[in-house]
A protein has these predicted regions:
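A well-ordered secondary-structure block
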Residues: 88-166
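C-terminal motif of bacterial Sec signal peptides marking the signal peptidase cleavage site
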Residues: 19-23
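Bacterial Sec-dependent N-terminal signal peptides
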Residues: 1-8
Length: 166
């Protein structure tokens, strides 16, 4: 449970960083908004935890499925933001905007995530809000960031395989 609280702090730090996105980009992206969001978040997570995780395909799919299953077209979340699969030691959380709505990013906000200022804001927010120790980070075996675009908003979730503490 302690690890879940720490991971929730990580995700809330991400929400704070995502909330800082206000500038608009004017370039046409080569990747979809969802792919851009996934790339930016995995980079920011790695810098925050001082790791070098790849965006694990299985975990990315868990995150995408959570968004598809739990987030309505209006951004409202059904049955909570957290998905825990104790048998497979997987935890997934959808980035929240408030207590009942997922954080929906516009295409302009997603494009802004490429800016190094986003990564710096995320890292600073994460380090300020999280109390993950090196031992906690070492228990993370794989991470994945999944994003799904519904209508004009892109929703982001994080999934991780976590080795239980002994």
């Amino acid at each position: 449970m302690k690890m879940l609280k720490k991971m929730a702090a990580l995700l809330l730090a991400g929400v704070m960083a995502l909330a800082l996105l206000t500038a608009c980009g004017d370039e046409a992206p080569a990747k979809s908004a969802a792919e851009q969001a996934e790339d930016a978040m995995i980079l920011a997570l790695n810098q925050s935890m001082e790791t070098d995780f790849k965006n694990d395909e299985a975990m990315k799919n868990v995150a995408r499925k959570a968004i598809t299953d739990k987030v309505g077209d209006d951004g409202k979340v059904k049955d909570g933001f957290l998905v825990v699969d104790r048998e497979n030691k997987v935890m997934c959380m959808i980035f929240p905007a408030d207590q009942s709505t997922a954080l929906g990013l516009t295409a302009e906000q997603v494009a802004q995530m490429k800016d190094p200022a986003f990564t710096k804001a995320f890292v600073d927010s994460f380090r300020g809000a999280s109390n993950l120790t090196k031992d906690d980070v070492a228990r993370i075996k794989a991470i994945g960031v999944g994003a799904v675009t519904k209508g004009d908003k892109t929703y982001v979730a994080f999934a991780a395989t976590i080795q239980p503490a002994h």
